[in-house]
Curated annotation (Swiss-Prot):
Keywords: 4Fe-4S, Chlorophyll, Chloroplast, Chromophore, Electron transport, Iron, Iron-sulfur, Magnesium, Membrane, Metal-binding, Oxidoreductase, Photosynthesis, Photosystem I, Plastid, Thylakoid, Transmembrane, Transmembrane helix, Transport
Name of the protein: Photosystem I P700 chlorophyll a apoprotein A2
Residues that coordinate or bind chlorophyll a B1: H654
Gene: psaB
Enzyme kind, highest EC tier: oxidoreductase
Purpose of the protein: PsaA and PsaB bind P700, the primary electron donor of photosystem I (PSI), as well as the electron acceptors A0, A1 and FX. PSI is a plastocyanin-ferredoxin oxidoreductase, converting photonic excitation into a charge separation, which transfers an electron from the donor P700 chlorophyll pair to the spectroscopically characterized acceptors A0, A1, FX, FA and FB in turn. Oxidized P700 is reduced on the lumenal side of the thylakoid membrane by plastocyanin.
A GO molecular-function descriptor: oxidoreductase activity
Gene Ontology BP, a term: photosynthesis
Binding site for phylloquinone: W671
Quaternary structure note: The PsaA/B heterodimer binds the P700 chlorophyll special pair and subsequent electron acceptors. PSI consists of a core antenna complex that captures photons, and an electron transfer chain that converts photonic excitation into a charge separation. The eukaryotic PSI reaction center is composed of at least 11 subunits.
Predominant subcellular localization, coarse grouping: plastid
Species the sequence originates in: Liriodendron tulipifera (Tuliptree)
Topology of this chain in the membrane: Multi-pass membrane protein
Binding-site residues for chlorophyll a B3, renumbered to this chain: M662, Y670
């Protein structure tokens, strides 16, 4: 018999129904469940797949550079970044006839093109790239790295080059290499690039390999470093009249602490950024020498954790047993990594707009909106994944004897308290926030807007004031002009910070009021409810009051029959599934808030947000409805405009989203009927009947239908909002 998919499971391969295909896809990456898997092969497979992942990333970024160099307008954009629209790539076959061809021919292009809203132009410009040749060189280099990654992945699957399990479990060596090698050396290298290429580039000096050794990034070279006069590197920074990319108003400093933004580009000073990366490099190079490996000096992770017993004994045996638990569980490690990466990705979203690092990106409003939304959605998916793998850890890897009375066991012991507190917070936030919104809605409906309940966020305003925002009149810490911190700040550290905080031309510490207070609590409700569902799913993964033997059923199971009184919807997978809806909902509120506030800020009518965001009808009418009008009008009986592709995507996104409900409302048999109908039609059609469908169609399982429904819901939801966001922003600001 020919080998059928999936090869990794003989049991599934012999299944005569469509279950074989579905379950094969579902378990393709669950290496632990494959036939003949050993711990050694498991680690080696994952290790090799990392190289494949890197190869894909390098190929993708190489493609970005290549297509912009080939079909973009980088060189003309560099001449006038504020008025030339950056081109991502050409459109081969614009639909909808000649009007579409004309609508999409822009940015100085000869034919129809897509505009880039990813910020790559600003990024490449900031780091010193200036010509198409530079872009091609970068694309080729990344292509080379991609090939190297593929070879490395293949090599590490060969018997002679396969690392052993002990190598994978050597935590200290891995920490040292990742801290020093990955973060330390790469940050140092990046500082080098900024100092030798990007900063001279911002001052009109074109540095490449041919003149790399001739152009000193600082007039005195390494002199100040060796003579201990490090402060010289910060003297004579670029002036406030500096024109980016030219020598006009340029200084000579390379490592500064100016704070604030470059007046022309509205981005952080490149010399501040270089200084930051040098500091990061130093910290991580030191950190990467802290752990004990060959020489018997430094920390042992296990000793650190074992020694960490809490004072007063109120946390039991503290961290005892944790080292082996974490080191032997890939799911625990993945959960920790995803939790960290998720938080970092969300922080990237918050900082990319408030402290823009790339020249002129702050004035490209559509790009700012797209990048914020993109990073928040990515963060949401990564964070929910952290809890999913936390739950799988509890089911597959947790050993109660090994963790007796330590902090992990105690989390399980008092899970009822954790869940009830989260539940109480969610209910409190939900009812109070909705109550305020609805009260305000009713007051506006009855024509008495003055009876709204409007709460000033005084604590948040106080925190902003403490950091130097003076408009609230709090007179505290950095907003107190007579205080020592304020006076020191004028000269010693970050003199540009206070100017930036109090300027209205950036997104740093935006002025907040009652509308912000309400939406902040709506978002807090979403975050706490999502967390409640995820935490409950993980803490109850091994068993709950209703189903104490849950861990024997695995991570995702549908039900265990009527005998127990209702065990459907209680697998750890179900918690993840429900949490993703809440996650998407919450990020919806986050992005609506960010986008609306910024649209009014950029248009100079902040009062619209302030007045309309205090009641739900305001959000529906003045944000969603008002901003979707251009979108719905993307193509009409009179022809096509450049928003037509977004209008089409807006409709298509709704279609995909709505398709999700077909699977979510337990219409699982539809799959069976659909395939059987198609198979029947093929079997009775000449030529088509040469291809036989061998697998007997069976209805989707509950879990499968939910997964298919969730996938459509998520993709449709994001497609719809992406189209709305880009069209409504670019329609206003170009």
């Amino acid at each position: 018999m020919a080998l059928r998919f999936p090869r990794f499971s003989q049991g599934l391969a012999q299944d005569p129904t469509t279950r074989r295909i579905w379950f094969g896809i579902a378990t393709a990456h669950d290496f632990e469940s494959h036939d003949d898997i050993t711990e050694e092969r498991l680690y080696q497979n994952i290790f090799a797949s990392h190289f494949g992942q890197l190869a894909i990333i390098f190929l993708w970024t190489s493609g970005n550079l290549f297509h912009v160099a080939w079909q973009g307008n980088f060189e003309s954009w560099v001449q006038d970044p504020l008025h030339v629209r950056p081109i991502a790539h050409a459109i081969w076959d614009p639909h909808f006839g000649q009007p579409a061809v004309e609508a999409f021919t822009r940015g100085g292009a000869l034919g129809p093109v897509n505009i880039a809203y990813s910020g790559v132009y600003q990024w490449w410009y900031t780091i010193g790239l200036r010509t198409n040749e530079d872009l091609y060189t970068g694309a080729l280099f990344l292509l080379f790295l991609s090939a190297i990654s593929l070879i490395a992945g293949w090599l590490h699957l060969q018997p002679k080059w396969k690392p052993s399990v002990s190598w994978f479990k050597n935590a200290e060596s891995r920490l040292n290499h990742h801290l020093s090698g990955l973060f330390g050396v790469s940050s140092l290298a990046w500082t080098g690039h900024l100092v030798h290429v990007a900063i001279p580039g911002s001052r009109g000096e074109y540095v490449r390999w041919n003149n790399f050794l001739d152009v000193l990034p600082y007039p005195q070279g390494l002199g100040p470093l060796f003579t201990g006069q490090w402060n010289l590197y910060a003297q004579n920074p670029d002036s406030s009249s500096h024109l980016f990319g030219t020598s006009q108003g340029a200084g000579t400093a390379i490592l500064t602490l100016l704070g604030g933004f470059h007046p022309q580009t509205q981005s952080l000073w490149l010399t501040d950024i270089a200084h930051h990366h040098l500091a990061i490099a130093f910290i991580f190079l030191v950190a990467g020498h802290m752990y004990r490996t060959n020489f018997g000096i430094g920390h042992s992770m296990k000793d650190l954790l074992e020694a960490h017993t809490p004072p007063g004994g109120r946390l039991g045996r503290g961290h005892k047993g944790l080292y082996d638990t974490i080191n032997n569980s890939i799911h625990f490690q993945l959960g920790l990594a995803l939790a960290s990466l998720g938080v970092i990705t969300s922080l990237v979203a918050q900082h990319m707009y408030s402290l823009p690092a790339y020249a002129f990106i702050a004035q490209d409003f559509t790009t700012q909106a797209a990048l914020y939304t993109h990073h928040q959605y990515i963060a949401g998916f990564i964070m929910t994944g952290a809890f999913a793998h936390g739950a799988i850890f509890f089911i597959r890897d947790y050993n109660p004897e090994q963790n007796e009375d330590n902090v992990l066991a105690r989390m399980l012991d008092h899970k009822e308290a954790i869940k009830s507190h989260l539940s109480w917070v969610s209910l409190f936030l939900g009812f109070h926030t909705l109550g305020l919104y609805v009260h305000n809605d009713v007051m506006l409906a009855f024509g008495t807007p003055e009876k709204q309940i409007l709460i000033e966020p005084i604590f948040a305003q106080w925190i902003q004031s403490a950091h130097g925002k003076t408009s609230y009149g709090f007179d505290v810490l950095l907003s107190s002009t007579s205080g020592p911190a304020f006076n020191a700040g004028r000269s010693i550290w970050l003199p540009g910070w206070l100017n930036a905080v109090n300027e209205n031309s950036n997104s740093l510490f935006l002025t907040i009021g009652p509308g912000d207070f309400l939406v902040h609590h709506a978002i807090a409700l979403g975050l706490h409810t999502t967390t409640l569902i995820l935490v409950k799913g993980a803490l109850d993964a091994r068993g709950s009051k209703l189903m104490p033997d849950k861990k024997d059923f695995g991570y995702s199971f549908p039900c265990d029959g009527p005998g127990r009184g209702g065990t459907c919807d209680i697998s750890a997978w179900d918690a993840f599934y429900l949490a993703v809806f809440w996650m998407l909902n919450t990020i919806g509120w986050v992005t609506f808030y960010w986008h609306w506030k910024h649209i009014t800020l950029w248009q100079g009518n902040v009062s619209q947000f302030n007045e309309s965001s205090t009641y739900l009808m305001g959000w529906l009418r003045d944000y969603l409805w008002l901003n979707s009008s251009q979108l719905i009008n993307g193509y009409n009986p009179f022809g096509t405009n450049s928003l037509s592709v977004w209008a089409w995507m807006f409709l298509f996104g709704h279609l995909v989203w709505a398709t999700g409900f077909m699977f979510l409302i337990s219409w699982r048999g539809y799959w069976q009927e659909l395939i059987e109908t198609l198979a029947w039609a093929h079997e009775r059609t000449p030529l088509a009947n040469l291809i036989r469908w061998r697998d007997k169609p069976v209805a989707l399982s509950i879990v499968q239908a939910r997964l298919v429904g969730l996938a459509h819901f998520s993709v449709g939801y994001i497609f719809t909002y992406a189209a709305f966001l880009i069209a409504s922003t670019s329609g206003k600001f170009g």
